[in-house]
Amino acid sequence: MASSNFIDYVKVCCRSGKGGAGAVHFRKEKHTPLGGPDGGNGGRGGHIILRGNVQLWTLLHLKYTKHIMAEDGERGGTNRASGAQGKDQIVEVPLGTIARDPETGEKIAEITEDGQEIILIPAGRGGLGNEQFKTSTNQAPHYAQPGEPGIEAWVILELKVLADVGLVGFPNAGKSTLLSKVSAAKPEIADYAFTTLAPNLGVVKYRDYRSFIMADIPGIIEGAAEGKGLGIRFLRHIERNSILLFLIAADSKDIRAEYEILLNELQKYNPELLHKDRILAISKSDMLDDELKAELKKELPKGVETVFFSSYLNQGLTELKDLLWTTMNKPKSDFME
């Protein structure tokens, strides 16, 4: 997914349809030129509706859409006929999309399932026709209700990538290479920092036709929570991942220190992230023999599953997938220290 095509934040002005006016009408029959009231009700306007679409990964299709409008309802007819309803405006969004009020930041709606629909902006109701106002004391009402106006409001749509596993690490930790090895995703890979400028998603095939989603989140650096590097823009995507897979290269100067920096950035951004299951994966492990791995394990944090792998030699990838799958499907327990 090219970074220029990955849009995870848009602000749009939405206007639901206004309701149609009720009709003022009286029956006109051959032998009853001035019959009773038969004005129909107006039709409701169209809603603005969010719909989840599993085929979408970005809000790119809404980037240049500043106004979203639904149809107005039609006025009531004669012979008690109701006016037609305005057509709803369906806005398809990726799973993980949240709608917020731009003034308060309050969450209005959240889409997490394919085909899920939520009315984002409700339509105006149609007005009642004069037939509805007939009473024993007023057999010929000459008035009807106007339709309710539609609602116009600015809305922020924010995407938080839904994935089972989120890759967390410094730039150049080998996250994109790993994703390309265990899935069909083709992220850009190069020997310089911030190659990944937007989250990349890949479907990891597992045993017996099972699979899970892995997300390569752009590299985190110290100070990311304060906006350094690519800043907090992409940290929010980690919030939707079930497991955080920390990737640190075997040739790092201090693996434990890097791990602690990454944890600290997540803690500063959102302490709830530390309640998620996490696994520490040491990449480029072809540089280490068994003795070095054993020594290294002694220095690493206790209580955190650690796995060594090499994308270059395809070593340890099966074990890594096994560990991810097992962790993903175990009963939830207290968070790790």
Swiss-Prot record:
Its cofactor is Mg(2+). PROSITE patterns: G_OBG, GTP1_OBG, OBG. Its main location: cytoplasm. One of its GO terms (cellular component) is cytoplasm. Residues 4-162 form the Obg domain. One of its GO terms (biological process) is ribosome biogenesis. Keywords: Cytoplasm, GTP-binding, Hydrolase, Magnesium, Metal-binding, Nucleotide-binding. It is found in: Cytoplasm. GO terms for molecular function: GTP binding; GTPase activity; magnesium ion binding. Its EC number is 3.6.5.-. Residues 163-329 form the OBG-type G domain. Mg(2+) binds at residues 176, 196. Pfam families: GTP1_OBG, MMR_HSR1. GTP binds at residues 169-176, 194-198, 216-219, 283-286, 310-312. InterPro entries: G_OBG, GTP-bd, GTP-bd_Obg/CgtA, GTP1-OBG_CS, GTP1_OBG_dom, GTP1_OBG_dom_sf, OBG_GTPase, P-loop_NTPase. Monomer. An essential GTPase which binds GTP, GDP and possibly (p)ppGpp with moderate affinity, with high nucleotide exchange rates and a fairly low GTP hydrolysis rate. Plays a role in control of the cell cycle, stress response, ribosome biogenesis and in those bacteria that undergo differentiation, in morphogenesis control. Belongs to the TRAFAC class OBG-HflX-like GTPase superfamily. OBG GTPase family. This is GTPase Obg. It comes from Cytophaga hutchinsonii (strain ATCC 33406 / DSM 1761 / CIP 103989 / NBRC 15051 / NCIMB 9469 / D465). The gene is obg.
